Amino acid sequence: MNSLSLVFWSILAVVGLLLFIKFKPPTIASLLLSKDEAKEISIQFIKEFVGIDVENWDFYSVYWYDHDTVNKLHHLGILKKNRKVLYDVGLVESWRVRFVHQNQSFVVGVNANREITFFYADVPKKTLSGKFEQVSPETLKQRLMASPDGLWSRANMTGTGKKEEDFREVSTYWYIAEAGDIRLKVTVELQGGRISYIGTEQEILTDQMSKVIRDEQVESTFGVSGMLGSALAMILAILILVFMDVQTSIIFSLVLGLLIIICQSLTLKEDIQLTIVNAYDARMSVKTVSLLGILSTLLTGLLTGFVVFICSLAGNALAGDFGWKTFEQPIVQIFYGIGAGLISLGVTSLLFNLLEKKQYLRISPELSNRTVFLSGFTFRQGLNMSIQSSIGEEVIYRLLMIPVIWWMSGNILISIIVSSFLWAVMHQVTGYDPRWIRWLHLFIFGCFLGVLFIKFGFICVLVAHFIHNLVLVCMPLWQFKLQKHMHHDQPKHTSL
C-alpha cells in the first residue's frame, strides 16, 4: 500500500460520506408523542372508561405502526397520497403501551392525535362488573374524540349488538371510518358499561389487491430463501470439514461466533419489552415472560453463532487451501474496508436520488428507515443489527460461498457473480418500488464486495459491510436525537 493509493482512497471515502449526507434516503418529521404523554393519556383513559387507576402499575411501551397496510399502500403507489390519513387515524406514529399488576394487564394504543385507537383488558371478568355508566354509541364516540382530524371524528356508527359471556352481558358498538383510500371498521366492546376492547380492521379501497398479494408472496419467498441458504451453507461447511483434507485455525471462527452471541444480548432489554407489550398473557408473570425472552435470545445467539463458527471454519480452511490470504495485513484491510463502506453509501445515495427525481424509483420512508430514528430505537440496536448482518452474511456469501463455487467452477468471476446473486435475492426489499432496482443494486454491491474479498481479504469486506450498515442505520438516529435535543422546547412541524 503506497502513499498515493492511501490518499486517493481516503479522498474517495470522504467524497462518499459527503454524498451520503447530501443525498441520503428521505425522512419525514416525526410527530410521535413522548412516552410520558402516551402513558398519561392511557392512565386517564383506563381511569375514565374502566374505573381502575393503573398509575402505579408496571409500565412497558413500544413504537407501533401498521406495517401491513403501509406496505400495501406503497405497492399500490398511493402511500404518499394517504400519508396524512395514516397519521390521523393512528396507523403510523403510534404507541402501544401495557400496564401490568398482579397477573392483570391493559394494552392501549395511542396515536399522535392523543386518541385511543386500540384497547384490550386482560383482567378477570369480575373486575369489569359492578355499576358503571352505560353510554350510547354516539356519546361514546364524542367522549373518545380528541382531534377534529382523528379516527373518532371520522367514525360513523353502523350498528350495535349484545351477547352473553360467562353470564355477563357484553354490548358491542360498530363504527366505520373512511378517509382517502382507507376504510377502518372499528369495534368497541363494553361489559357493564366498562370498555373491555377497542379494535380496528383496515381495508384499502382498491381493485388491485390481488397484484399486491402476489408481490408480498414474492417478498416472503425470497425471505425464506435466506434461511434455506444458511441451512445449506452449514451443511456444506460440515461436509467440507469432514471429507476434505483441509487445515485451519479455530481462533478466528471462535471470535466471530462469540461476537454474534454477545451482540444478540445487546438488545435483550428491548426484546423483553417488545415481548411483554405484544405477547404478555395475564396467566404468566412478568418474570416468566422475561425469562423466556432471555432464553429465546440466548438460544438464537447460540444457533446463529454456531452457524457462523462452522461456516467460517470451512470457508477459511478452503480459502487457505487455495493459498488465499484472507486475514493477512488486517490494518490495511480495515482501512480499505472503511473506505469501501463509505464509498458505497455515497454512490448508492446519489444513484437512488437521481432515480427518484426521474421517477424511475419510489422509496417509502415508512418502510425503509421510518422506525430507525423514532423513539425506542437505540444505538445498541443499530450496532447489533450492523454487526450481526455483516458477520453472518459475509461469512456465508463471501468467505464460504466464493471459495466453494470457485472450487466447483474453476472460474473466479462465476463465483463472484453467483454468490452476489444469491446474496441479493435473499434480501427483502421492502420500501422500494420497483423491487428489481433494489435487487440489482444489491447484486452490484455484492460483486463489489466479492472483488474486495479477492483483492484484500475477508476483514476488508466485513468492515465495509459493517460501516455501510452502521452509518445507514445510525445516522438518521443521531440526527433525530440531535434535532430533538436542539429543538426540545419548540413546537414540532411535519411535512406530511
Swiss-Prot record:
Required for production of the bacteriocin SkfA. Accelerated cannibalism by skf- cells is seen on solid media but not in liquid media. Induction: By Spo0A and PhoP, during nutrient starvation, especially phosphate starvation. Repressed by AbrB during normal growth when nutrients are plentiful, in association with the transcriptional repressor Abh. Disruption phenotype: When the skfA-skfB-skfC-skfE-skfF-skfG-skfH operon is deleted, increased rate of spore formation; a double operon deletion (sdpA-sdpC plus skfA-skfH) makes spores even faster. The lineage of its organism: Bacteria, Bacillati, Bacillota, Bacilli, Bacillales. The keyword Cytoplasm does not apply. This is Sporulation-killing factor biosynthesis protein SkfC. It is found in: Membrane. It comes from the Bacteria.
